[in-house]
């Protein structure tokens, strides 16, 4: 197996969902342990063998080279398979396909099939997949009005974010930034998001406990020492009116806008998720937050936009001023305003992904 393909299969080996790599002839050249446990060792077989295996029933057409998606039913649990073309030049052309349980996140993917059917470029396919795993702007659980924007610097970005319900009183939100760009970084965003979902119950004990678990999962990948992920977690307890925060090297600190328009920054230190973070402890900070207050999370691509004449960056101060000025506007408007203002602040772009979350506490 070639070095580039070997690095990708090494990452797929750690996934907790099924994945394989196939060549242009639809021959399976690699199958990860999870998929092998379900289907057996299919290396060397054609991809069509999955459709004749046991109780797996195809409910939509087989994936094609254009990056279409297909749904499978496994014991009445819906799974969706995604395919991304991978052109490694002289090493050959391949497809990476993975099968993910979509019973909890199905609403996120409702437009995936139609979007992917028209796309031929491998980077555009990966970009659509990456964007589609992000939460939609909506009101969640009658508790949080959630609005976000994501603008990657390149076709494949490294920012990602999500929110999820832990129980009837507690809700988890986070934003993260993977170092670098390209196929490896985009695959790592999918992996880290999946690990958050798998380990989310650890946040009930503490957001710092969740970070410690993610560090272990990351280190198990044995990636290059230059690879790292910054993350900030915020757990909202509706019953106690508390927001508990842990930071793993994310240099854009959470910003709280109170219902009277006053702003508060929550500065916290912490090591980025990386090899050198193994065994380190993370801190927690808990603040009071009430209905009518607003939580803003963002990545450094926004604050690093630089004025080409003065050399000054847009900075967290630029975010704070806009958040205070437009605190009475809805989150969707504010997210767009901050994005637009940071972009036109300079003629020269910082060339980094830009993401922002506006979470209004409703109850």
Where are the regions that the model predicts?
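Sensory modules in modular signal-transduction proteins
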Residues: 1-33, 37
């Amino acid at each position: 197996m070639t070095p580039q393909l070997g690095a990708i299969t090494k990452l797929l080996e750690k996934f907790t969902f099924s994945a394989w790599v196939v060549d242009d002839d639809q021959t399976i050249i690699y199958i990860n342990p999870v998929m092998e446990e379900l289907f057996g060792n299919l290396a060397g077989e054609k991809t069509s063998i999955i459709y004749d295996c046991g109780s797996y029933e195809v409910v939509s057409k087989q994936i094609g080279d254009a990056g279409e998606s297909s749904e499978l039913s496994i014991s009445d649990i819906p799974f969706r398979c995604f395919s991304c073309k991978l052109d490694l030049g002289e090493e050959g052309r391949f497809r990476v396909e993975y099968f993910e349980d979509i019973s909890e996140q199905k609403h996120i993917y409702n437009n995936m099939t139609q979007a992917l059917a028209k796309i031929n470029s491998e980077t555009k396919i990966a970009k659509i997949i990456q964007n589609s795993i992000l939460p939609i702007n909506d009101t969640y659980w009658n508790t949080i009005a959630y609005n976000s924007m994501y603008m990657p610097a390149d076709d494949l970005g490294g920012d990602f974010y999500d929110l999820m319900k832990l129980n009837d009183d507690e809700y988890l939100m986070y934003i993260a930034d993977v170092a670098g760009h390209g196929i490896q970084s985009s695959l790592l965003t999918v992996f880290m998001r999946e690990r958050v979902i798998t380990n989310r119950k650890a946040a009930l004990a503490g957001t710092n406990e969740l970070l410690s678990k993610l560090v272990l999962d990351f280190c198990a990948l044995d990636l290059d020492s230059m690879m790292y992920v910054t993350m900030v977690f915020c757990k909202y307890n509706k019953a106690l009116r508390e927001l508990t925060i842990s930071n793993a090297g994310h240099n854009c600190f959470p910003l709280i806008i109170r219902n009277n328009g006053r702003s508060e920054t929550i500065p916290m230190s912490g090591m980025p998720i990386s090899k050198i973070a193994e065994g380190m402890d993370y801190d927690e900070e808990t603040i009071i937050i009430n209905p009518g207050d607003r939580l803003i999370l963002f990545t450094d691509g926004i604050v690093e936009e630089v004025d080409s004449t003065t050399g000054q960056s847009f900075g967290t101060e630029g975010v704070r001023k806009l958040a205070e000025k437009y605190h009475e506007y809805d989150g969707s408007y504010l997210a767009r305003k901050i994005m637009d203002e940071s972009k036109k602040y300079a003629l020269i772009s910082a060339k980094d992904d830009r993401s922002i979350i506006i979470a209004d506490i409703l109850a």
